[in-house]
């Protein structure tokens, strides 16, 4: 009986499907409907950094990754480390807990950073509160960006004042570690002029008990249009003060639960001196840019930057891997202070000339840049002996405890301090 019911069901099913097959065959003469489309997502079409002219990315002979303002907002990008997480061929380094450090196609750098196409080579942690988009150029490009750029450059494009729009935007966030962040972006249209103010404050805390700090910045910008000329003037103040935490060192094979890699079980151990490890940065930056339409085919653009930077970095750090025995592990530590004072002057001018020869259109670029930089950098080494200033006394092997017990440290500045660095440099560069 069961066999009969199953067979009947199959027959009914086949019978029911017969007309459908016939209908499908009858519909073969119906007009075809084709739907096409694409999702832009974060796609951008043109770049200005690669050639200093608005050029389609497909026409730029270099690999370029563009992070748009929408992507920065959606992914809450607040640091270079956040940024490069989504960019192939680029990775972030630790930066000794006091600066941005990236590897671009195998080339490690702390200096190949630019703002609006102007060099930004001071060592600090960059924020993105006033950044409209970021263009990452991979591969050597000294012809466009000048010195450096062996593996590529990271160029941040700042937000400009908008003459025909009022904008009010604020962001607030906090996390379970106790850190919090707030930013504001206000643009006020004033006829043919505009005022834009960006600012942020961030209280720094994370899973490491010894780490804390704060950073904040403000960037007012005013723009005005006078006939065929647009001018923009901006000032930025940046302050960053934090504990210099260089993380967890590695351990030799056969020690600390047998890793030949990062030591295990020291998630909260601070491998430094809590009342000494500190990074403090302050910057005053003045920017000016203009664009003049001289004729239908000629456009003249200028940019200028003045920056005054002051940074101090003090740290005790793990100079060796963890050694000793499982019962009595040890680690070698060293210390130094690294103050830097720098003043930077940059002036840049470009003339764009559009011409035609027959059916071909050309865009010619004539430009030049003048750079001046006065810098004073010193490395003051720490010694674990008040009388014998030798390389042997620059390192001390201590027991691995939590907290780490650091012996008294003596800092000596000048030629008597073995292996110290005291560099004063003045750079004047003209390129065209």
Give the ranges of each region predicted by the language model.
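Transmembrane beta-barrel strands of outer-membrane/channel proteins
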Residues: 170-174, 197-203, 233-239, 302-308, ...
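Outer-envelope beta-barrel architecture signal
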Residues: 164-168, 180, 191-195, 227-231, ...
């Amino acid at each position: 009986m069961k066999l009969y019911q199953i067979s009947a069901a199959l027959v009914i099913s086949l019978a029911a499907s017969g007309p459908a097959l016939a209908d499908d065959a009858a519909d073969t003469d119906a007009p075809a409907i084709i739907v096409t489309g694409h999702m832009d997502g974060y796609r951008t079409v043109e770049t200005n950094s690669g050639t200093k002219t608005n050029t389609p990315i497909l026409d730029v002979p270099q690999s370029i990754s563009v992070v748009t303002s929408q992507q920065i907002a959606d992914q809450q990008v607040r640091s270079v480390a956040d940024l490069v997480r989504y960019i192939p061929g680029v990775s972030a380094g630790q930066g000794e807990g006091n600066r941005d450090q990236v590897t671009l196609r195998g080339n490690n750098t702390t200096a190949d950073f630019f703002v609006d196409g102007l060099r930004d080579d001071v060592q600090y942690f960059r924020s993105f509160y006033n950044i409209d988009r970021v263009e990452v150029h991979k591969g050597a490009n000294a012809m466009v960006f000048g010195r450096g750029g062996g593996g590529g450059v990271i160029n941040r494009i700042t937000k400009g004042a908008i003459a025909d729009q009022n904008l009010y935007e604020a962001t607030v966030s906090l996390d379970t570690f106790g850190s919090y962040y707030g930013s504001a972006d206000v643009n006020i249209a004033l006829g043919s002029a505009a005022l834009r103010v960006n600012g942020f404050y961030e209280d720094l805390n994370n899973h490491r008990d010894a780490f804390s700090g704060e950073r904040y910045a403000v960037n007012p910008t005013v723009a005005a249009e006078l006939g065929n000329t647009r001018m923009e003037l901006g000032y930025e103040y940046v302050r960053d003060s934090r504990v210099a935490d260089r993380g967890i060192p590695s351990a030799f094979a056969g020690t600390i639960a047998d890793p030949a890699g990062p030591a295990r079980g020291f998630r909260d151990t601070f491998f430094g001196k809590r009342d000494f490890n500190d990074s403090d940065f302050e910057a005053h930056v003045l920017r000016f840019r203009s664009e003049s339409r001289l004729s239908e085919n000629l456009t003249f653009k200028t940019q200028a930057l003045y920056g005054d930077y002051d940074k101090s970095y003090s740290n005790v750090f793990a100079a060796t891997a963890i050694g000793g025995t499982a019962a009595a592990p040890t680690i070698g530590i060293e210390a130094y202070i690294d103050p830097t004072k720098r003043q930077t002057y940059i002036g840049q001018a470009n003339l764009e000339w559009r011409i035609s020869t027959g059916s071909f259109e050309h865009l010619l670029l004539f430009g030049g840049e003048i750079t001046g930089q006065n810098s004073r950098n010193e490395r003051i080494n720490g010694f674990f002996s008040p009388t014998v200033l030798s390389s042997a006394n620059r390192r001390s092997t201590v027991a691995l405890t939590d907290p780490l017990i650091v012996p008294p440290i003596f800092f000596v500045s000048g030629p008597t301090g073995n292996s110290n660095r005291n560099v004063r440099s003045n750079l004047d560069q003209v390129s065209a």
